[in-house]
């Protein structure tokens, strides 16, 4: 173990033993120890935000926000975070011994899938990939990463004396206090790599493509001419659920005198339609999953991409006879 690593671990241990003072928005200050927003907080705030780290000292208080008070901290963005099943936020400011400050925000989401989702939603295409958490990116004065159920942002004021390397070191220490980072969502492997636009895979928790029946969907962009096409994958709990949603979407896309066109293959059912915004749309069902191509240059290109994606989506385990509908 290096001297630096030992120093970080010792500092974290000391901070946890002391216990932070936590202020909960809209509540009486909770004093020393960990204060719940609603129920218990399933991680150590003091371990994630220790009092001192090599080169950094935390402000005396940690402020926490829950689902009903998040708007006080990020008024304009609170609704989006709630859509990604935000649970609570712990935030504190650190002062750098050599000058400069940085604010740390730890957003706990309901699970790793939603933590990835909000991280990907705010991903900057100009940020540099850094090794922190499951995945992280660093900008000129910021580091953002996700780890387990958490989405974490560290931001130094514009023109701050804190160099990027020191900000990354602080981010790494915070990540270490959050426990095992976990792994990228398995759904990322559903998307064929050929033509996939970098950093375009998003998790859509609800109302994908403006359809209330499309929840927990995944989408990505694919290189195309003149514009990239979109691939959307929507898993359902049952084959009947997927079949019913497909029928509703087909009805939605149909126009008087120009209904959707049925396709014999691929999958367990398919159709194609034209839409004013996306252009060509190809929808295929494979068991309890819908795979949708929007805006591809041709039906052949869309079908090839959808077919490739279907091969990558794992088939659900076979249940007792009579459950989940039939293909």
Annotate the PLM regions:
Residues 7-16:
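Bacterial N-terminal signal peptides
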Residues 158-188, 295-327:
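Surface-exposed amphipathic alpha-helical segments
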Residues 1-5:
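Positively charged n-region of N-terminal signal peptides that target proteins for export
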Residues 50, 55, 59-84, 109-148, ...:
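Short Gly/Thr-rich strand-loop-strand
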Residues 82-118, 152-154, 219-245:
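A short acidic-to-branched-hydrophobic micro-motif
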Residues 108-111, 120-122, 156-159, 235, ...:
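A mature extracytoplasmic/lumenal domain signature
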Residues 94-100, 136-148, 163, 220-230, ...:
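Short, low-complexity cationic-aromatic patches
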């Amino acid at each position: 173990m290096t001297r630096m690593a030992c120093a970080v671990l010792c500092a974290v241990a000391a901070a946890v033993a002391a216990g932070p003072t936590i202020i909960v928005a809209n509540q009486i200050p909770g004093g020393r120890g960990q204060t719940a927003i609603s129920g218990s907080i399933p991680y150590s705030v003091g371990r994630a935000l220790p009092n001192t780290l090599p080169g950094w000292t935390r402000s005396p208080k940690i402020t926490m926000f829950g689902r009903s008070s998040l708007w006080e901290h990020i008024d304009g963005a609170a609704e989006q975070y709630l859509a990604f099943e935000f649970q609570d936020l712990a935030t504190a400011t650190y002062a750098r011994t050599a000058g400069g400050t940085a604010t740390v925000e730890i957003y706990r989401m309901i699970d790793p899938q939603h933590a990835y989702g909000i991280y990907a939603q705010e991903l900057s295409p100009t940020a540099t990939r850094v090794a922190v958490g499951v995945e992280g990116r660093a900008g000129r004065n910021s580091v953002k990463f996700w780890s387990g159920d958490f989405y974490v942002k560290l931001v130094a004021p514009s023109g701050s004396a804190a160099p990027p390397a020191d900000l990354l070191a602080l981010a790494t220490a915070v990540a270490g206090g959050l426990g095992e980072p976990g792994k990228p969502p398995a759904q990322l492997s559903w998307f064929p790599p050929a033509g996939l636009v970098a950093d375009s895979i998003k998790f859509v928790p609800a109302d994908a493509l403006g359809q209330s029946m499309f929840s927990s969907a995944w989408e990505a962009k694919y290189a195309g001419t003149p514009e990239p096409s979109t691939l959307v994958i929507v898993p359902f709990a049952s084959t009947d659920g997927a079949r019913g949603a497909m029928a509703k979407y087909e009805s939605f896309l149909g126009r008087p005198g120009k209904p959707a066109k049925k396709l014999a293959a691929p999958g367990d059912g398919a159709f194609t339609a034209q839409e004013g915004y996306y252009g060509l749309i190809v929808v295929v069902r494979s068991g309890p999953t819908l795979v949708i191509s929007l805006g591809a240059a041709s039906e052949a290109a869309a079908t090839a991409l959808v077919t490739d994606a279907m091969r990558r989506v794992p088939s659900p385990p076979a249940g007792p006879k009579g459950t989940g509908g039939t293909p």
